[in-house]
Every structure is written in C-alpha cells, then in structure tokens.
Amino acid sequence: MDEDAPVDESNEGIIGCLPSAVNIHHIEEIKELVDQLPIIFKLENECDETAAEVNYLRYSRLLHLYQEQPRLLDKWIPEIVANLVDLVTLIGIDVSKPRAMTPLSRESLKYLSDLCIVRGSKTIVRLLPHQVHLLDPLLQTLEYYETSQLSDHNQRNVLLMWLWIVVKNPFDLRRFDPTGDPDNVITRIMNVALHYMKWDWNSSQASAALVIAHCLSRTDGIPKVLSFLSRLLDSIKTHHENKKLLLADLILLLAILKHVDRRVLTGHIGTIHEQLSFLYPIDEKKGGLICKCLVKVVQRIGLIALKPRTCSWSYNRGKRLLEGMLDDNEEYSDEPSFSNKVNSNQSCNNEIDKENQWNDGDELENSEIVEFALMHVLEALSHSDTAVRWSAAKGVGRITVRLPNFDLATQVVGSIISSHFGEVAEYSSWHSHGACLALAELAHRGVLLPSLLEDIVPALELSLVFEDVMGRHQNGNQVRDAACYAVWALSRTYEPSMMAPYLQRLASALLCGALFDRQVNLRRAASAALQEMVGRQKNVSHGIPLIQSVDYFAVTNRQKCYEHLCVPVAEYSTYSAIILRHLITKKVVHWDEKIREQAAISLEKISEIRLENVSDDYYMEILDDFLKASCETRISPFLRHGYLLASGHLIKGLTSRGMDFSSKQTEIAWIPHILWPFCDMTTQPGALIRRTLCKFIQLVSASKKVLLLEKDKSEWLDVLLQLITDPREIIRSLAKTAVGEFVMTYLMNDEELIQKVKTRVIAAMTKCSDESERIGMGMICESLNSEAVDYEMFESLCNTILTPTSSDAKWALARQQTVFALNRISVNSSTETFNRIGQKCFETLYKAMTDYTTSANGDIGRFVREASMRAMSTILVDAKTEPPFLDEHVIKSAKYMVQQSAERISRTRECACACLKSLVKCEITGRCLPHIDLLMNIYSEPMDFISDRTVFQLKPLLDLGSEYYEQLILGIVVSAGGLAEGTQKTAKQLLLDHQREICENKPRFDHFLSTCADLFQRARKVNRIGNSFMQILPQIFGNLGIYEQCPETSESIIEMVDTMKTIAVRSSMMSRQRLSIDSLGELLNCGKKSTVYRSALTMILDTLNSQQPVLRKSAAERLYEHLCCAEESDDEVLEVLATTNWQDENDNVLKQAVAGISEKLIF
C-alpha cells in the first residue's frame, strides 16, 4: 500500500475534472457515510429507503471521482473495507438469527462492490478475511441466494470473490464434512458456483468460474479434472449454437486452463484440441465477447502444449530502469562519437554470434497443436473487434516466448509483416492495428530480434501516418495509436546501438504525429513515445529540446501545435524538410477540412522564417505544383481546397520576408477565372471552392506584393461581388474579409473600380430582389474607405431603413448590415463629413430602434435594434460631434436603450445595458444624461441583465417618473405581453406594483395613464407592441384606483377604451378579440352608473350574439365571473349563463338567452 499518498487539504488538487491528490474531506465523508449505515438500518427488516439511496449515491459519487487514479485511495481502503466487513452478517455465523441476509449486510456488500469497481477486485479481495471458519457461512449464504429472488448481482459477486480467496487456503476440506470426505465439500462448493454460471453475462460468472477452477487446482480436486473437463467439453459441443450457454462454458474453460496445473492438463490437451476444433476458424457472427474467449482458449491451449521456459535465444537488454541508464558513463550527444560507433559495431557482432547459438534449442513438442494455436491467434489479429485483436496480440507474445528456437519466432514475425502490412492494410485497418499490437507485445517479451528491425521499422513508419479515408475514421486512429505503442515498446527493449540505424526515422515520424495528428490522444501517445525514445536511446538529434517543446501537455491544443509549436521545431535542420514534407503530402490533402486549413496556416508560419537547409526554390516548386494541381479539371474538391489554401498561405508567408513573385504573377492572377466554373451554388463542393476562393483572394491581397493588371483587378472584383452576395452566411463573411483586404491593396487609388462598386451598391439599395444581395452590398460599404462613400451612397443606405417597401419588409438581416455600414462610415469619417451626415444617420438609427420584424425564427428585428444601439453608443462616445448635437441625441439614444433594457430578450437587454454603460462611463456623453448616478448603479453589470428577474432593478427608474418614463413603460409592457414566461411574470409584477403604488396619487397616476394611452394609440399598427398592450390592459383596467367608480373622468382611460374597441372591431385576429373581452370584463368592476361600465356591459352582451362560438363562450365566462363577485347578482341570470351551451349552433335558443340576460342587466 502507498502509505504516503498525496493529500490535498484544499480544493485545488484538480486536473480537469479528476483529482491529482486525495481530498481529505472526501475520505472523511466516505467514512462518515459508512458509519451511517447502522443508523439507517437500525431495525431488522425496515429502513429509510430514501436516506439509504441518498447515502449510497453520495458514497458512489465520491469513490468514482478517483476512478482514473484509484491508487490515491490505497492508504484508507483497508480501514473502509474492515468497517464494511464488520457490518456483514453471514448466514450460519449466528444460529439464533433467521437464515436470511439482513438489509444492512446486503447494503454493506453493495458498498464493497463499488470499491471493487473503483480499485479492482484483486486488490479488495486480498483485504477480506481469509479465516478458514468462514467457508461454511459463505457457502450457506450463497446457497440461500440460489433461492432468493433479489436482483443484487453485485453483492453476490463480492461473496463469490470472498469464497475464492478462502478456498485458496491450503486447509483440509475434511474438517467441514461430518463423514470426513473432502469430495462432498468440493462438490458443494462447485454446485454453488455452477448455479451462477447459468446466469446472463455479468461479473458473477467470472467469479464463479474462478472458484471452480481453484477447487479443481487443489490437490483434493485434481481427480475431478478429467470428468469435469469431459462434461464441459460435451456441454460446449451441445450448446455451441446458444450464445449465452456457450459464453458461460468458455469462461469456465478459460479459468480451468489458466489456474489448473499445466502438468495435470498436459495429458488432456489433445482431447481438448480435438473437441474444440469445430469452433475454429472463429465465426464473427457469434459476437465480440465469444470471439475474444475463443482466442483466449486457443492461446492457452498453445501455452499448455509448450513448456514454460525462459528461452535462451530471447533478446535481453539488461538495464530497464531509467535510473540505471542515467548512471551510465556514456554522455549524451546529438551525433554518436567514434568510440560509441566502435562499441556499437562490436555489440552487433556479438549479437550475430549469439544468433548462431540460439538455433541449438530443443525440438518443438506438440507441433500440431502449437501450429493450430498460432494459426488462429494470428488470424484473430485482423478480427473486426478491437478487444479480440488486443487479446490475440497478447497471445502471440505469450506463445512466441515459449518457442524453442528463434527460427520459429522469425517465421511468426514474418507472417505478421507479410499478412498485415502493405497492400492488405489499405483495404482493412484491422490488419495493421492487430499487427502493431502484436509487435509491441513481442518486443516487450524480448522475442522480436534485432535482425528483424529492418523489416519492422518501415511498416511502423507507414502505420504512424495511417489514415482510413474511406472507412470509419476511428479505425485509422487505432492503427496510429498502436504504432505509437509499438515504437514505445521498441525504445524500451533495444540497446541504443541496435536502434541507431532506424532511430531518426522513427523519431521523425513520432514528431510529426505529436505535432500534426488530428486526435489529441494520439498526439499525446506520439509525444509519450518520443519522450521514451529520447530517454532510453541516446542518439536522437536535438532530443531534449524536442521533448521540451513537444511536451505531453503542450500538444493538447491542436491549434497551438499547428500555429506555434511546429515553428521552433522546424528550425532544427534535421527536421525542417521532414515536417514540410509531412504537411505537404499528408495534411494539405487530409480528408478533414479543418486539418487542411490548419496545415496551410502551418506552412505560412514556417515559410515566414528562413530555414537552414530549405531553399526558396523549394518553396517556389511547391507553390507551382499546388497552383497547377488546384487548376486541374478532374480533381477532388477536397484536394483543390487544400492545394489552393496552401498556395495562398505560402504566398503570404513568403512575401512577409521579401520574396519576389513577379514570375508567378500570371498564374496567380488567373486562379479566380479558372476556378469560377467550379463554384456551383447548389452543391457542397461548389460551396467549398467558393469559401476557398474568398480565403485565397484575402491572403494574396494581404501579402501586398502580388501585382495585378487592371483587367485582373476587374475580374477579381467581379468574383468578389458574386461571392459577397452568396445566400450562405459563412461565404458572405469570408468574402467580406477578402473584400476588405482587396480594397486596401488594389482599390485605394482606382477611381474607375470604386465607381463601379458605388453604382452596384446604389442599385442594390434602391431596387433589389434578394436579401443576400443587399446584405453583401452593405458589407462592401463597411469595407470601403469612408472618403469613398459619397452622400448619394450614404442616402441610399439610410433609405433602406427609412422608406422600406413591401418586398423588403422582412429583410431584418439586410437592415442590420446597413446599420453596421452606417456605424463604420460615421466612425471613420472626418468631423466635417459627419456634420453633414450625422442628422440623417441618427434619424435612421432611431427608425431602426422600432424594428420588430418577426419570422419563423422569432423576433429577428432584435438584430437590427441591437446593431442600432451599438452604433449609437460608438458614434456618440467617439465624440467627433459638436456639443449641441450631443445634447440632442445622447438623451434620446439613452431613452431607446432604457426601453430595450426592459424588453423580453435576454441578449437584447444585455446589449442595451452595455451600450448605456459606455454612455454613462464616457465623460463627454455622461454629462448630458440626467440622473447619471442612478443609471450608473442600475447598469453597472451587463451580464446581470441576462436574468429575467433583473427587470426589477429598473423599479427605482420607474418610480422616478423622469425623462426615461415613457420608453421604460413601453419596454415593460412589451415584456409583459410577450410569450416568454419568465419575463412575462416579472414585467407584469413590476408594472402591477408600480400601478398600485401610484393609483391613489392623482398626478402620478394621470401621468401613467396618459403615457399608456399615448403609447397604445401609437403602437396599434405594430402587431407585436399592440398585442402586448392588449395583454396588459386587463391588469391596467383592474387597478384603476381613484378612477374605479367614475373612470370617464380620466380622458386617458376613455382613450384606451376607444382604441381597444377600434382594434377589436377592425381586427380579424381571434386572439385580439378575446383579449378585448378580458379587458371589458375588468371594466365591469367600475361603478354601475358610469358610462364606461354601461359601454363595457353592452359590448359583452353584444358579443354573446357573436358568430364565433369561442367569443360567445369567453364573454359568458367573463360575465359569469363578474356577477359571482358582484354585491348584487341575479340568480336567474347566473343560471342562464351557466346552463346555456354557448357553443351551440341553435341561434334561436341563444337569442332567447341573451334577450333574457339583457332584460335583467340593462337598466
């Protein structure tokens, strides 16, 4: 046990979500949870099931935190196990108690089972009591479970493991049988275990097989081996079609072949081989688990047929620990010295002499059985299941290490290389994966002879860069991972002199894998293998600097590897050409688009620096090849994308250090013209090439060293104008960046092309049939120099928002882009220019703040409002304006932002808060804002406004009734009438609290009502705001305060009632008419002598005669509710309202009912 396990008394010992040290609080809590068990199960057959479940879940959660590093718990596990064992009462120990397992015992076994899962059964079972007297109670307990219907399989597994460790004791079994016959006890134990072999597959089967195998391995159990094996083999032959029974039999056979003495089984090996031969070759249809068991069976048959010996011919390195190697007197150097070379040659000669002696081994016994085992284990190396291949690889190593001479081992390795690498690997990744695992296992055991390295190393080099492009990509990942493991094993196995001829090749392949592999676990595997190689082999060039740069943790981030780590590594002359070749041949043409992009960036970063052994001509040749390949007609779109992207990045990287591209000017200029026919708008390959062209033009323009003729500029501009109006957002975004670079490089002084752009922009803004075209033209305006934007173009931008047409009413994204363009133009313009366009700009932005366009995606107008708020804050804070302009627009802009800070969309509220905060923080704009201290306190943290309940923070501003009152009321009303439940509740509650506070204060209440009436009148044409007001009207009319008895004395109330009537009468929307009925129902609470009451009652009675059944029913319900709560009510009217079917189609019945109600109520 680890007595010095690291303890973390803080909460900082965490890497990711895994602990790096034991948190002592976790240990204390685990112990406390175990101590709680007797309290929870205080009664014999009763317990608090909820408390027991909560206790167990917390215990399991704490334990599983250490699942990846269970050794951290070793210091405390013995105490925990002892405490749990004390709580277990086995049947038969106390004869006074009933023959049944108590709930406390079962729960304790369940806790022990979790410990087994986390730390491993072999570790935990050693800590269980081994006393001989426990045998009978364990047997009685397991026999009780045979008849039990409980589904506690984990607890039974713990009992079986406990029985196994007790059976291992070398005691005389006759003590436990009255007749003194040990066979009776063994039979009893085996019968108990055999019961669990019939279950469906779970861990109990393996434990039961272990118990049986150890019974047979005992001296008094050996006579039973023959008969038991005979029955087992007969059962396998009988049940080979039944997967459940076959699996159980194979697990039992495996346990017997492993644990029973080889000398006992040797005599029966021929029978076993003969009886099981019908199961081979392995049928993959039987399932992965059975196939794995069959592989294990055949390898153990082979192991029994061979003598267990340490082969004299196996390779023995000697020192395996790094401490011993570090004590070596040889000094590390990048190039081996002359003396090292001499020693290496002498070592090689010695090894050859040893090989001559190795042939003098014994002859192979049971050759037919061994050949049979090796043949099927080697076949299993190409099985489709990973677990089967892994088991087969271990089997190859175990069998080969027992072969009597090295010629046989050489044949095994030759078979692996010829059958699993080369052409066959191109069609199946399983072959390469299994072969790499097998080579690693052979190297571990020292049976992969140095003379075979010449054949092995090329195969491993190919496997380290293997890609299964046409299949499932994870298969290729497995091969590369296994290849890293194999190289790691080779590094640990061989002397530096043996590995010296191949060392640099393998180190270079590992370095490329550590830097450029797609998967993080494979980059880490390659890094670990490289570190092992540098540590154990002393001839890796620049080894120490390499493993410091390509560290296990440093390679975690792929972007960092491609953009940063590869550059200093490429500066080492040994690896410069290798890294470039790997990027060019493997990564630029990779199947993953993201890898191709990152490889191109790596080429740019590396080409920016001068490398010692890489000439500029080499780069030019690469560029020439890429440009030609990207223009070929019959080429994959993926390859075209990779080549063209790499060309662009190479151009940019090389021009940064002054390379001349005048010789390539024509080829580069013709790229867009040649590739445009491949830019189909309707296909994915076409979209890919469009994205690539955008990036290529951006990179070439950013280099600023590639000169274009006027004709070429015009063609490139035409291509960009097509790309920037693409319907796909990602292509427009890339084209926008490309246009920005293209304009800065080629159009700054070209009046003709700028005029061409202006004409296209004005035409698109004036008359356009596609939203994406207008978005694209807005992006171009954003990219142009502000001096190039004349007033005509600026006015055309503004008019798209100020004077929308029916065809572009839904184009919210186009208006958003227009606002972006206005923002950029205004910020970049001179003071003189802004004084000319400022008023028009803010008029447009205010109009944009009223954009509530909705679509299937919801409120898309919010994008326009958010862009407008950012534009207003940016322009005002930039302070290119005169004080009168600020005085006029700062407060007005702030009002709109206050309104948006109360609306229902969380991100819009956050944006409004951020914009207001910038206005408040700025000294120039802040002095124009009233109540700045209050604003600063409310809008201090934009992230807070994401929460729905943040609306309550606006109450001080609402109570103030200041300049922001009208916009704040509008924002709250829009939220209260929205569909989002969270903001709807909070906004309604805020408005209700405010109304109740002021309803007895006539001036303030009049101000509130007049504000609502004015906003309601103005918003009735905007569906969203009008609907919100209709939603909130019942609440307003239900709390009229001082106007409740005589509401007509308030002009604002009358105005809202009239507006509501107009909407209800003219609207064809059923929802609005139902909301008007709810509002009228609230008005019935007014004084009965008031005009408003009579008007509301009349309208409700008229609605009872409506043609719409839904409206009739709604009106009847509202009238019934009012009459039930009224001080005076007519029972006959209530009975008529309740009993009449208002959704009936019989007009006469309904008319009579309405006439009777009207006669009673109207006076």
Curated annotation (Swiss-Prot):
GO cellular component: lateral plasma membrane; microtubule
Alphabetical keyword list: Chaperone, Microtubule
SUPFAM superfamilies per record: ARM repeat
Superkingdom of source: Eukaryota
Reported phenotype of the disruption mutant: RNAi-mediated knockdown results in reduced microtubule growth rate.
A GO biological process held by the record: adherens junction assembly
Keyword Isomerase (UniProt): no
Keyword Chaperone belongs to the record: yes
Alphabetical list of Pfam families matching this protein: ARM_TBCD, TFCD_C
Gene3D superfamilies (UniProt xref): Leucine-rich Repeat Variant
Single GO term (MF): beta-tubulin binding
Similarity comment: Belongs to the TBCD family.
Function description: Tubulin-folding protein; involved in the first step of the tubulin folding pathway. Plays a role in microtubule polymerization.
Annotated protein name in UniProt: Tubulin-specific chaperone D
Natural source organism: Caenorhabditis elegans
